């Protein structure tokens, strides 16, 4: 590498260090370096590193530092740094003598590392130096001289590190006060080292054979730059600057060094030998560094500069030739520092005009070579240092020069001309962004240009007139001239004007002569001559500039480009620039300097006069200028003759406005708008109103004369109409604009409105302008410019037209939809008075309503619009008008000034709901949301009116009072109590004996009642919406004042809406268009009702009860309405149940969390005190149903003592019963009911308490009944069973035929809960292992079985109910029994309860009753599908959910057996959509069906497909005929199942067009369920039976899987994984399988959404790939020609599916263990790796090992495994190939897993070594579960029977495939 610098060890850096000097500088010894005074003796000289003396561990690390790769060096430095940090010289075991050789070696190595190519290496080397220096302390002293040079190089390293580790190391080792001593101590050696570095070249700095030239060049530049910076660092730390004060006239700074003369000479030698040569280096980095050092030399080494001043002047002032912008910062620093240091002397020793100025001019012409931000701000400082001798040719200006002195101004021409030429480089909008950006480089040039111009005028222009003329008349004028004449501008517009105006003012402030010269400049005709401007604007010829005129004083302006076409300025650009110019002038007009204001006023006056003089010749430009000026200046600042000038100008402007109107055919908002603005501005300056009227009359006369003159000459009617419209628009615009400045009454004119033709819809905007000051008023306030009587005429005209339209449409019952025009008039000519569109009336009415004009006629118009709006929103035939009238809704249904009108409008809304069916608007056509919103809006607006009047009393809210009175007086509302239907499932607090009291009622079959229910629902919802919007507290407050029954009515009607009252079926007959529309409205109305009931009704009822408690407090129980409520609880018929429910709701609130505990206790006490329960003398006993219901409702708040008393009373009474049949069953029923309610209530409380305390409460913790009491109940079961047996006996039936009916009627309801609590008790006892189990006796068990059988089989003893099976109460009774019996059955089959409750016959009992439950479930589903269920759909929801839970608890064996009986029914439910049930139930039905079918399909013995062999009749006659081949037919077990699987026309095909159709989505989900069941069965059966199912999937050349994949794949979200943790199941080995349907996907959503179908499709797709990979591969191959489809398939499987399948395959392989049944004595091992995707299998037998490796591809199973046999000792090549074919066949055609393939290989090996050969036809040892047994007697080869038979069929001969022997 280059020269051998170590040869001979020459040079100062290898000289011995001065230990004597070091000794004087070292301090006391310490662990840290504290100075050189610590040395007490001389040290031995260190020469070449002695590696033999270095410790071996360091020697190894130092050798690592010599490695070529940087990674090794970095690791070596890290280890070395770690070693250095562990050095402890104070340790007794540390060898001090080892430091010297180590440091000698480190010196040698560090010098190499500081210029390493890797930045990290250089940084780590400095860290190592810091570490060892801080550890060895004073022992570093002898090595400082050799280390200082490279150390400073490292400090000055120009890397991108945020932390300078070399500098940190230096500062940590040496204290601040000792650092100067360090630099002195090692100064000479360090400088010598740096000088040697400067001698390097790219050829000597490295080996060019092994290192690229680029790296060498980079290394060379880094070495030179860092060395130069290191020299600068030494200079700055060893010298100081001082000012020589001996000569006051001297401008130079002398430098004295604190070092010796020898050091200065060393610097001089460095600079003389090679420093200036670096200025010519090709490396910009080296040149930049050299310029930086040059600045330091100028400031620090003044003596050296003085000695070589001529060279320095030439070099420094010649730096303008530098073209690299990255170096210009230091270049300018050096130049300015040199000129500051030496002033004029700097120019004396150099030929400026030959050596300096040409380079400077070239620098400026080139745009400073790109350094805009640095160079342009530096040109002015440079100009200040240029002496006069160079500028004007004389050493200094004369003290009093003559103004006419002739001097050379060539310097200024060159300076400013070259700056102009530099603009061609700088002005590049594409490169430098937005032309209007303030950061444009041209803006920097502009600032530089103007600053130099001002400075030149100030320094030289004031003394030499010639210079000043050139600067102002030529240069400054050209700026203005070009800016207002040329389109292109190189500068930002606003910044240019600001800078130019600022410079103009500064020039004017320099002297009075400058001010006069500038004023004359602006007053001259050449400054913005409008006549010339007009010619310039109309001239299409471009202007061409020539560079031949550049030497002329009137040279081309700065903006012109040489030899380029300059585009004249456009009108828009000129107007924009003039506007900006005037605004900037206005901003500068507020200065206190009179000269500033004089200059600006001269400019503005000149512009104003030009605009006024050219109004006729150049109207648009003149008007714009006038508008700009008047908007920024006061008129008295511009004109001098006052009012006369204003009148003259206004007249000129009015004529111009009229001329513009006639020429353009209308008001041009560009020119005309500006004209109006200027006229208004001038008109507002007239102080006298009489003068304003006079001027205004002149303006009107101008327009009227124009209309009349043109009217006489006009031939067409349309022209006259347009002229009137345009003229009126102009006047309206003018009046509206002047209204804010002038009294508008002075400008009003009745003639204006008379010229308008109202029926012409073109006049709409004109009318709006007349009524509203919409040009100057953002709020569009009503401010008409016509008299009030004219407004009244307009209102009456609109009213009459609207009435005519309404009467016509209502009487004729016209039909209009959205496609009709609705009476629109599209005629552009004058419209006929009788032909007015509804749209036009809407717009006119909106204008009038928004005006809030106080007029009775306007209120009448409002009422008429309200009528019409009600009609169109509730009549389908007028639905097309909704869109046309929507915009007027905000103005309707607002209060008028008359309360009677408001009540009339409100009555219209109420009556629209309460109309008879014979009217036009029927209850089936109501838009409830619209009507309620209108009523709310009307009442609220009335409240606001009272608030505005300062009256907050609710008594004055007459509209609300009127509404409530109408509500409470409605007969439907009053009679709603008779139609309330209560669902037992919602309010199951009491024993529903009212169901038995109402069994004879048949109200459901009365058509009039059904219609009343429908109508009542709509009336109630309308009223509820209004009441809720105003707050329930307001309703309560009103009701309390009126003291009426409104609260009770509201409670009952809220309960009615929350009950089971259903809407009648929607009519579906559609015969005409009108009927179709009506049907749509009916559905919409019903949806409104259902939506309100579902979302608001329950909350509203609870909120109302809460509001009642907040209003009344504990006084609520003393209210008459509450006492009435309590008195009706438990009464006869339906009313008893209704009031029981209401009381229960009040108690629910008291016991809820919404009621505070203190308030709850108070309310409980008050309620119990207010309710009197009639008891007998014996204590707490119950004798009536009313009393029973009261106690049952009050149980949550009764005291424990009362509850205990009721419990003991019931038990005592029941314990006294005997086997004799009692005479009164009612009392027994009451006793059973209250006891059951107490137990159930207590169980619920315990459950709630356990949930709050998060702990399990056992029976022992708080017993409900004692063990003795439970035994009493168990005995009671036996007693009731004895009664039942006796009652059903033939004797009793003959003697008392009604006894059985009475028994079942009175006891059955009570037994439901009674049996439930007993069964629950037995279950709890038997689940407690510490308790003795309880078994029911035969009689007790028979009692449970008999009742349960009756209930589940629906064989009710109440035969009279059969007459009214459509009756609601019968259905409620049936639902109650069905639900409770299911709960009992649930408990029986849970855990092991069945063996305790039904001992001995549990299995048969479960099968028999499970079949009954399945049949009941199917019947309920069927009834709900056919809409025959008269009960509430919510009841069905509860029951169906309980059915689902019951089936889930059944064992798979039971479900398998019962599903066999109803397979087709269950399958059909998967694909059925039920409109009559909720979507949730629809999904629940599917889920339950799937759960039952899963037990069938998941059974491994289930065979879905059967195969049949079909023989062709020609087979026996012609064996050579191909048609004689035998065929196999496959039959699926169910036609319905097959239809669902393949019915794509009903699922995914229509889904492409309608993705949100619930019917399609539901059927599609059922189809996906069926496919999932099919795959479930496929996964359970063995490989041999899969071939039959595969045969059906491919039967009749129909690829069923391919068809299915083509349907579902487009719906899959390709960016989402198909399998989540919630949709997978895990087998015993922990492998994930998607064999269960992912119900977690659908359970979270209420609807069956398209997104849900997407997820289900992706899940099913995964299952297909997992279980049927061969068919998926075939499908993928078929789509390989479709590049887009193929890419999607490959990407989706590779990204999401393959990783899961591969993971499962590997887990399955690793979890495999050999079974005990394996009789082979061979050792078989198998293992897999997920990371490498490899499976390795080894087979060891008789000391012989055979192994294979299976490689799984990333897109497995699309791509089959690759098999490699790593060891095959003892097995032939052909045998291996046979096994490979067998494994490939298994994977390709039989869908085997990786483990199956490995086990097949193992079995093949076992058979192979047992002497069994593979079949030569299929190359497999196993076929259909058999081994080759058919043997050829000749060749002795054995074949599979199936293979050889197939061979005979295909080859049409019976010869051996190998030896061709006839085998027949």
Swiss-Prot record:
Pathway: Protein modification; protein ubiquitination. It is found in: Cytoplasm, Cytosol. It is an enzyme of class 2 (transferase). A zinc finger (RING-type) spans 1815-1860. Its main location: cytoplasm. PROSITE patterns: ZF_RING_2. HEAT repeats lie at residues 100-138, 265-303, 349-377, 378-418, 598-635, 642-668, 669-694, 695-733, 800-847, 900-937, 1021-1060, 1080-1117, 1137-1176, 1185-1223, 1271-1308, 1312-1349, 1599-1636, 1662-1699. Its EC number is 2.3.2.27. One of its GO terms (molecular function) is zinc ion binding. Belongs to the LTN1 family. Component of the ribosome quality control complex (RQC), composed of at least the E3 ubiquitin ligase rnf160/LTN1 and nemf. The complex probably also contains tcf25 as well as cdcD/CDC48 and its ubiquitin-binding cofactors. RQC forms a stable complex with 60S ribosomal subunits. E3 ubiquitin-protein ligase. Component of the ribosome quality control complex (RQC), a ribosome-associated complex that mediates ubiquitination and extraction of incompletely synthesized nascent chains for proteasomal degradation. Ubiquitination leads to cdcD/CDC48 recruitment for extraction and degradation of the incomplete translation product. This is E3 ubiquitin-protein ligase listerin. It comes from Dictyostelium discoideum. The gene is rnf160.
């Amino acid at each position: 590498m280059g020269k051998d610098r170590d040869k001979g060890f020459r040079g100062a850096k290898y000289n011995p260090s001065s230990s004597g000097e070091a000794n004087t500088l070292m301090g006391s010894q310490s662990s840290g370096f504290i100075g050189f005074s610590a040395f007490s003796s001389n040290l031995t000289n260190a020469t070449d590193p002695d590696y033999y003396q270095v410790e071996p561990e360091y020697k190894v690390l130092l050798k690592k530092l010599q490695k070529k790769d940087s990674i090794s060096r970095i690791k070596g430095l890290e280890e070395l740094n770690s070693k250095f940090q562990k050095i402890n010289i104070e340790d007794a075991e540390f060898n001090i003598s080892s430091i010297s050789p180590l440091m000698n070696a480190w010196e040698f190595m560090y010098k190499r590392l500081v210029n390493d190519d890797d930045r990290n290496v250089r940084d780590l080397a400095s860290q190592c130096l810091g570490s060892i220096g801080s550890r060895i302390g004073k022992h570093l002293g002898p090595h400082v001289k050799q280390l200082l040079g490279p150390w400073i190089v490292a400090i000055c390293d120009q890397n991108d590190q945020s932390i300078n580790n070399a500098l940190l190391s230096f500062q940590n080792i040496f204290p601040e006060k000792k650092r100067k001593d360090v630099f002195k101590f090692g100064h000479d050696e360090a400088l010598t080292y740096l000088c040697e570095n400067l001698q390097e070249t790219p050829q000597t700095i490295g080996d060019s054979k092994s290192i690229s030239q680029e790296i060498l060049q980079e290394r060379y530049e880094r070495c030179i730059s860092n060395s130069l910076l290191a020299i600068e660092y030494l200079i700055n730390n060893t010298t100081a600057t001082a000012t020589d004060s001996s000569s006051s006239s001297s401008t130079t700074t002398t430098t004295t060094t604190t070092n010796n003369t020898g050091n200065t000479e060393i610097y001089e030698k460095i600079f003389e030998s090679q420093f200036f040569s670096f200025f010519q280096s090709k490396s910009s980095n080296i040149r930049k560094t050299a310029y930086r050092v040059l600045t330091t030399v100028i400031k620090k080494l003044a003596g050296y500069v003085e000695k070589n001043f001529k060279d320095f002047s030439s070099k420094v002032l010649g730096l303008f030739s530098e073209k690299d912008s990255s170096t210009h910062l230091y270049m300018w620093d050096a130049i300015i520092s040199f000129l500051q240091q030496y002033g004029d002397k700097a120019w004396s020793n150099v030929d400026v005009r030959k050596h300096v100025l040409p380079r400077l001019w070239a620098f400026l012409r080139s745009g400073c070579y790109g350094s805009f931000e640095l160079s342009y701000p530096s040109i002015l400082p440079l100009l200040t240092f240029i002496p006069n001798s160079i500028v004007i040719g004389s050493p200094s200006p004369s003290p009093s020069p003559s103004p006419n002195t002739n001097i050379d101004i060539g310097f200024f021409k060159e300076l400013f001309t070259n700056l102009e030429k530099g603009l061609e480089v700088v002005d590049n909008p594409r490169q430098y962004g937005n032309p209007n950006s303030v950061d444009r480089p041209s803006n920097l040039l502009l600032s530089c240009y103007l600053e130099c111009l001002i400075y030149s005028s100030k320094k030289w222009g004031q003394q030499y007139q010639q210079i000043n003329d050139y600067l102002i008349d030529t240069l400054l004028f050209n700026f203005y001239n070009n800016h207002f004449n040329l389109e292109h501008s190189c500068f930002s517009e606003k910044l240019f004007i600001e800078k130019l105006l600022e410079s103009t003012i500064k020039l004017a402030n320099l002297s009075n002569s400058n001010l006069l010269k500038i004023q004359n400049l602006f007053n001259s005709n050449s400054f913005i001559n409008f006549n010339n401007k007009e010619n310039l604007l109309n001239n299409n010829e471009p202007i061409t500039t020539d560079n031949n005129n550049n030497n002329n004083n009137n040279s081309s302006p700065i903006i012109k480009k040489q030899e380029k076409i300059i585009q004249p300025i456009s009108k828009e650009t000129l107007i924009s620039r003039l506007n900006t110019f005037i605004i900037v002038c206005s901003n500068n007009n507020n200065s206190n300097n009179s000269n500033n204001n004089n200059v600006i006023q001269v400019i503005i006056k000149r512009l104003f006069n030009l605009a006024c003089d050219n109004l006729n010749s150049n109207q648009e430009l003149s008007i714009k200028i006038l508008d700009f000026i008047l908007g920024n200046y006061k008129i008295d600042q511009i004109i001098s003759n006052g009012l006369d000038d204003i009148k003259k100008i206004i007249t000129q402007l009015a004529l111009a406005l009229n001329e513009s109107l006639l020429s353009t055919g209308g008001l041009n908002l560009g020119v005309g708008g500006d004209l109006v603005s200027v006229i208004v501005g001038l008109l507002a300056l007239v102080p006298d109103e009489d003068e304003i009227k006079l001027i205004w009359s002149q303006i009107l006369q101008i327009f009227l004369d124009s209309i009349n003159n043109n009217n006489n000459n006009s031939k067409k009617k349309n022209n006259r109409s347009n002229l009137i419209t345009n003229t009126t628009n102009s006047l309206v615009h003018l009046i509206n604009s002047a209204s804010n400045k002038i009294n508008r009454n002075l400008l009003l004119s009745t003639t204006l409105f008379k010229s308008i033709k109202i029926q012409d819809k073109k006049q709409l905007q004109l009318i709006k302008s007349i009524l509203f000051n919409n040009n100057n008023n953002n709020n569009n306030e009503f401010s008409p410019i016509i008299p009030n009587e004219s407004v009244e005429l307009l209102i009456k005209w609109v009213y009459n037209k609207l009435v005519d339209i309404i009467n016509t449409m209502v009487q004729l019952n016209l039909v209009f939809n959205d496609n009709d025009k609705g009476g629109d008039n599209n005629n552009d000519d004058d419209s006929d008075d009788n032909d007015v569109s509804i749209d036009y009336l809407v717009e006119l009415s909106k204008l009038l309503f928004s005006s809030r004009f106080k007029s009775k006629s306007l209120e009448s118009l409002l009422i008429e619009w309200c009528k019409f709006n009600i009609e169109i929103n509730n009549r389908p035939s007028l639905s097309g008008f909704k869109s046309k009238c929507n915009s007027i809704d905000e103005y309707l249904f607002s209060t008028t000034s008359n309360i009677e009108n408001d009540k009339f409008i409100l009555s219209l809304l109420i009556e629209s709901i309460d109309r008879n069916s014979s009217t036009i608007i029927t209850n089936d056509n109501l838009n409830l949301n619209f009507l309620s919103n209108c009523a709310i809006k009307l009442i609220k607006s009335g409240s606001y009116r009272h608030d505005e009047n300062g009256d907050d009393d609710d008594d004055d809210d007459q509209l609300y009072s009127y509404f409530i009175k109408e509500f409470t007086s409605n007969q439907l509302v009053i009679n709603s109590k008779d139609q309330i239907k209560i669902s037992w499932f919602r309010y199951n607090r009491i024993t529903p004996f009212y169901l038995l009291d109402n069994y004879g009622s048949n109200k459901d079959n009365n058509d009039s009642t059904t219609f009343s229910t429908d109508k009542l629902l709509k009336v109630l919802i309308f009223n509820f919406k209004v009441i809720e919007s105003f707050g329930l507290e307001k309703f309560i407050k009103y009701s309390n004042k009126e003291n009426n029954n409104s609260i009770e009515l509201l409670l009952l009607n809220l309960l009615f809406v929350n009950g089971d009252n259903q809407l009648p079926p929607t009519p579906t007959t559609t015969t005409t268009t009108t009927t179709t529309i009506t049907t749509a409205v009916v559905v919409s109305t019903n949806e409104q009702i259902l939506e309100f009931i579902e979302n608001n009704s329950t909350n509203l009822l609870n909120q109302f009860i809460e509001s009642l408690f907040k209003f009344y407090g504990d006084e609520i129980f003393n209210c008459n309405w509450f006492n009435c409520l309590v008195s009706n609880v438990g009464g006869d018929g339906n009313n008893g149940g209704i009031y029981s429910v209401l009381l229960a709701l009040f108690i629910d609130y008291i016991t809820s969390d919404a009621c505070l505990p203190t308030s709850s206790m108070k309310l409980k006490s008050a309620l119990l005190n207010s309710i009197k329960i009639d008891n007998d003398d014996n204590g707490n006993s119950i004798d009536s149903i009313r009393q029973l219901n009261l106690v049952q409702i009050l149980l949550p708040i009764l005291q424990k003592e009362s509850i205990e008393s009721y419990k003991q009373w019931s038990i005592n009474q029941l314990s006294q019963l005997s086997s004799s049949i009692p005479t009164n069953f009612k009392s027994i029923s009451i006793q059973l009911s209250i006891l059951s309610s107490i137990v159930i209530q207590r169980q619920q409380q315990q459950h709630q308490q356990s949930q709050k305390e998060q702990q399990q409460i056992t029976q022992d913790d708080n017993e409900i009944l004692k063990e003795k009491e439970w035994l009493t109940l168990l005995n009671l079961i036996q007693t009731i069973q004895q009664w039942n047996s006796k009652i059903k006996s033939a004797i009793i039936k003959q003697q008392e035929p009604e006894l059985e009916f009475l028994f079942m009627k009175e006891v059955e309801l009570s037994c439901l809960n009674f049996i439930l609590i007993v069964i629950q008790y037995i279950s709890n006892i038997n689940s407690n292992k510490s308790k003795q189990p309880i078994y029911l006796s035969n009689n007790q068990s028979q009692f449970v079985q008999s009742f349960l059988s009756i209930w589940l089989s629906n064989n009710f003893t109440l035969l009279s109910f059969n007459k009214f099976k459509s009756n609601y109460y019968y259905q409620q009774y049936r639902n109650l029994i069905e639900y409770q019996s299911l709960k009992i059955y649930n408990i029986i089959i849970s855990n092991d309860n069945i063996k305790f409750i039904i001992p001995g016959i549990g299995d048969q009992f479960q099968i028999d009753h499970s079949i009954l439950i399945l049949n009941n479930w199917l019947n309920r589903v069927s009834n709900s599908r056919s809409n025959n269920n008269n009960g509430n759909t919510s009841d069905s929801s509860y029951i169906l959910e309980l059915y689902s839970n019951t089936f889930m608890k059944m064992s798979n064996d039971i479900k398998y057996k019962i599903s066999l009986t109803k397979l087709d029914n269950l399958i059909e439910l998967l694909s059925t959509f039920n409109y009559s049930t909720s979507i949730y139930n629809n999904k629940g039905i599917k889920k339950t069906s799937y759960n039952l079918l899963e037990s069938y399909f998941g059974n491994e013995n289930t065979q879905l497909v059967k195969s049949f062999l079909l023989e062709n009749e020609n087979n026996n006659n012609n064996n050579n005929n191909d048609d004689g081949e035998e065929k196999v037919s496959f039959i699926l077990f169910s036609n319905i199942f097959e239809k669902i699987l393949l019915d794509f026309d009903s699922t995914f095909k229509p889904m492409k067009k309608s993705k949100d159709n619930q019917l399609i989505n539901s059927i599609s989900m059922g189809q996906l369920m069926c496919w999932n069941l099919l795959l479930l069965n496929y996964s359970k059966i063995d490989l041999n039976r899969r071939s039959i199912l595969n045969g059906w999937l491919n039967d009749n050349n129909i690829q069923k899987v391919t068809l299915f994949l083509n349907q579902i794949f487009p719906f899959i979200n390709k960016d989402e994984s198909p399998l989540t943790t919630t949709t997978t199941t895990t087998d015993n080995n922990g492998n994930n399988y998607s064999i269960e349907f992912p119900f977690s996907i659908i359970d979270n959503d209420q609807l069956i959404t398209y997104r849900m179908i997407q997820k289900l499709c992706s899940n099913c797709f995964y299952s297909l790939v997992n279980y049927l990979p061969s068919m998926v591969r075939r499908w993928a191959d078929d789509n390989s020609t479709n590049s887009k489809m193929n890419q999607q398939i490959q990407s989706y499987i590779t990204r999401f599916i393959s990783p899961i399948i591969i993971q499962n395959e590997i887990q399955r392989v690793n979890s495999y263990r050999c079974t005990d049944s394996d009789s082979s004595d061979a050792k078989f091992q198998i293992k897999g790796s997920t990371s490498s995707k490899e499976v390795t299998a080894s087979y060891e037998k008789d000391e012989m090992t055979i192994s294979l490796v299976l490689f799984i591809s990333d897109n497995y199973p699309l791509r089959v495994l690759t098999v490699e046999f790593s060891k095959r000792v003892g097995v032939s090549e052909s045998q291996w190939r046979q096994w490979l074919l067998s494994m490939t066949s298994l994977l390709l055609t039989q869908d085997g897993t990786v483990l199956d393939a490995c086990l097949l290989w193992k079995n093949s090996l076992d058979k192979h070594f047992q002497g069994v050969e593979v079949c030569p036809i299929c190359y497999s040892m196993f076929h259909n579960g058999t081994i080759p047994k058919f043997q050829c007697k000749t060749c002795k080869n054995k074949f599979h029977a199936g293979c050889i038979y197939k061979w005979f069929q295909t080859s049409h001969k019976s010869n051996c495939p190998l030896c061709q022997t006839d085998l027949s």
